Amino acid sequence: ETDNIESFQLNKNTKTIIYEKSQKVSSIKYNTLKVPCGKTFNINLSDGTNVYLNSGTSIKFPVSFKKESDREVFLSGEAYFNVQTNNASRFVVKSNLSSAIVFGTKFNFKDYPEDSFSEIILTEGSLGVRKLENTEKDKLVIIKPGERAKVSFETGEINRSRVNTKIYTSWIEGRIVFRNENLENM
């Protein structure tokens, strides 16, 4: 059983959509939001999770999450998630190759179609990363705040490393930060 969304509110000044709960329905309905190149957008999902969407990003999400089951969204591009804690259900972000499994945390998930990898940068909390075509026996890589999990499209390997999270999340504030980067990487 799910909470039906009776309406949503669009705030043009803050570029935010806020969904409001009302009555219950039995099936999950999905919306897809595509952010044009050169723009960013913010959306508050029905469970209270806040998502900042970067330029050229697409997200598919349920109008309302089904109670006591995984809260799944599907991402192509880059987004920063501030996940609302819910002990009864995990929050799962799925992309082309990988997925992030969280309970309540803040992280950046990047998976543009033209990249040869996806990466998840954790700023707060804890989360697990695994390949998308996973089976339960596939290893779940746990990352901690200040760490990045990088999933290779070619090999499916997940590499973990320490990073300065501000470099990866500065786009939320409209800034671009470069530190010791080659011109070809920019």
Language-model regions, residue ranges each:
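A residue-level detector for the "anchor" residue at the start of short, highly conserved motifs
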Residues: 1-186
